[in-house]
Amino acid sequence: MDADSSSRSPRDTRRRSRQREKMPYFADEVRERDRVRNLPKLKTTQKRTPTPPRERRSRHERPRSRSRTHSPEQSRCQRRLSRSYVRHRSGSRQKTYSSSCSRRRRSRSRSRSRGRSRTPRIITVPVPVPAAEYSYAYGWPPPRPHFNPMYGALPFGMQPRPLNPYFGAYARPPPFRYRAGPFRPHPRYSYRNDRQAPN
């Protein structure tokens, strides 16, 4: 065996396990599901504090007050709420809003992911198909009367069997007989009487 491990001598019969075929985690469904499931556990210890509540500006309010003595809290009827009250209210409002919002968002995404399943749901509805057991030209050709030996040959030639219904775009091609049918003389023909006289 050379130092070059890629070239192996025919004598080298050591069994080596075939290298497992590598597949990215996002292509393997189970691994990807476990990875997504474990993602929240890998979060760093330092957490981002929620964004402080932004001040709400009404549409009709001036973009910024001209004087420093007037703050947005005072603009409503020149009455200043106590700061502790404002802080208390804003904290509770932010908490309730964020918790309900996150809950709503989580439930919506959960329901959306439930709708996306791995195998598409195929809804089968039993639809009655009329006359499914009958072939395309079921009644054709119409039944012919059975042979009755009591009656002799007809005085007129039989018409050919009626043709099958044909809805082709072009004219029906002529029938091609792969093998000639048996020779049947005219039903009124008699070998004894109607034989051609030899000349």
From Swiss-Prot:
GO biological process annotation, one example: female sex differentiation
Highest taxon, organism lineage: Eukaryota
Protein location: Nucleus speckle
Compositional bias (Basic and acidic residues): 20-37
Basic residues compositional bias, start-end: 56-69, 77-92, 102-119
Example of a GO cellular component annotation carried by this entry: nuclear speck
Keywords: Differentiation, Nucleus, Sexual differentiation
Region (Disordered): 1-121, 178-199
Main location per the UniProt record: nucleus
Further facts: The sexual regulation of tra occurs through a mechanism of sex-specific alternative RNA splicing. The non-sex-specific RNA expressed in males is not translated.
Annotated function: Member of the regulatory pathway controlling female somatic sexual differentiation, regulated by Sxl. Activates dsx female-specific splicing by promoting the formation of a splicing enhancer complex which consists of tra, tra2 and sr proteins.
Record note on domains: RS domain directs localization of proteins to the speckled subnuclear compartment and the purpose of this localization is to allow colocalization and co-concentration of components of the splicing and splicing regulatory machinery to permit relatively high rates and/or efficiencies of reaction and interaction.
Name the UniProt record assigns to this protein: Female-specific protein transformer
